A protein has these predicted regions:
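Nuclease-adjacent, charged terminal/linker segments that flank catalytic cores
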Residues: 1-58, 240-322
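Low-complexity, highly charged intrinsically disordered N-terminal segments
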Residues: 35-41, 65-74
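Catalytic micro-motifs at enzyme active sites that drive phosphoryl/nucleotidyl and oxygen chemistry
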Residues: 79, 88, 110-129
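Catalytic cores of nucleic-acid endonucleases
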Residues: 142-204
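C-terminal amphipathic alpha-helical segment
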Residues: 185-257
């Protein structure tokens, strides 16, 4: 399966789906430093700022921003790398109904080098999980400034040959590359689905997988409680809690004189039971309660809540604009 979007398929998305992908594909400092849950909010906002500074919308299409021409080569490469991560996550969610998407580097960073085993083969960058079908998928992302066939081939070879994930054949083994069209500056992508391999097996713990996925998101709530201990977390939807995040800049509206209302704000929501697991893991949930059992018991129905200013993923994480 391979297609450039401009000739075969146009994938439509909105800013809330993009925010969800930015939050759940990994944080910048996760790749260069140990866990530091005093900086989760800054990490998330910095990722949003990077995307806003790199992309513009023109006639409904995402284009490369002219301001990127003032960046040096290394800065452009970093931006392209993160765009590859973010949009691979977005494509997996929209086109392949992947509910959970995690960078495999985090296993070693948090749980040690034996937490994820790939039979001596270099592991793919991402592993995905679909809750309803209980199926795994593997992904390799690469982000480039221009079309780079060799980079796509390298990503394809990274997922090629994987026989199983936790003793199950992967539903997909996909290499994805994002890049900017040299003629119009449009953001485009190519995806290739590799055949099932015969040798390498990926083995890791599902409980650790889910813990890594939700942990940094719940740490945003911890930060919010430390900043505003009494009124920062509210119950907007039954079974969920949400916090308010303030982005850089203002909503420019000359008629609005209220400084608070002009601020760019959005709400992030998480199921109460998942927050409770991380905050009271050995309290009311008991020592035998697992995150896996909590996630499997969640009755998430995103279609019930979807509105123009609201988006909920199948992982139960939602954003709403206020």
């Amino acid at each position: 399966m391979e297609w450039p979007f401009y000739s075969s398929q146009i994938i439509e998305t909105n800013n809330l789906e993009l925010l969800h992908a930015i939050l759940t594909c990994g944080m910048p400092n996760q790749f260069v430093s140990p866990w530091h849950h005093e900086k989760r909010t800054q990490e998330f906002i910095s990722k949003i700022s990077m995307v806003e500074n790199t992309l513009i919308v023109n006639d409904g299409y995402l284009l490369k921003s002219p301001t990127t021409e003032f960046l040096d080569a290394s800065e452009k490469s970093v931006n392209s790398y993160y765009l590859g991560l973010i949009f691979t996550k977005l494509f997996s969610m929209k086109e392949f109904q992947v509910d959970y998407f995690l960078h495999t580097t985090l296993f070693e960073q948090v749980y040690g080098k034996d937490a994820l085993i790939c039979n001596g083969r270099k592991k793919p960058a991402f592993v995905g999980y679909q809750k309803e079908s209980k199926s795994w998928s593997i992904w390799e992302s690469t982000g480039k400034r221009d079309m780079a066939p060799k980079a796509l081939d390298d990503a394809y070879n990274q997922v090629l040959g994987i026989k199983s994930v936790n003793d199950e054949s992967p539903e997909y083994a996909i290499a994805c590359m994002t890049y900017f069209d040299t003629k119009h500056g449009e953001l485009q992508g190519i995806m290739r689905n590799a055949s099932v391999g015969k040798k390498a097996n990926m083995i890791f713990d599902k409980e650790q997988f889910l813990n890594l996925y939700y942990r940094h998101i719940c740490e945003l709530f911890d930060e919010s409680l430390r900043r505003k201990p009494f009124d920062s977390v509210i119950d907007y939807i039954d079974g969920y809690l949400e916090i308010e995040l303030e982005l850089f800049g203002l909503n420019v509206d000359a008629s609005d004189k209220d400084d608070y209302l002009r601020r760019r704000r959005l709400k992030l929501g998480v199921p109460k039971d998942i927050l409770g697991f991380f905050q009271y893991n050995h309290g009311r949930y008991g020592n035998n309660q697992t995150l896996t059992s909590i996630v499997e018991a969640l009755d998430v129905n995103p279609a019930e809540y979807q509105e123009d200013n609201f988006f909920m993923g199948r992982d139960g994480i939602y954003f709403r604009i206020i």
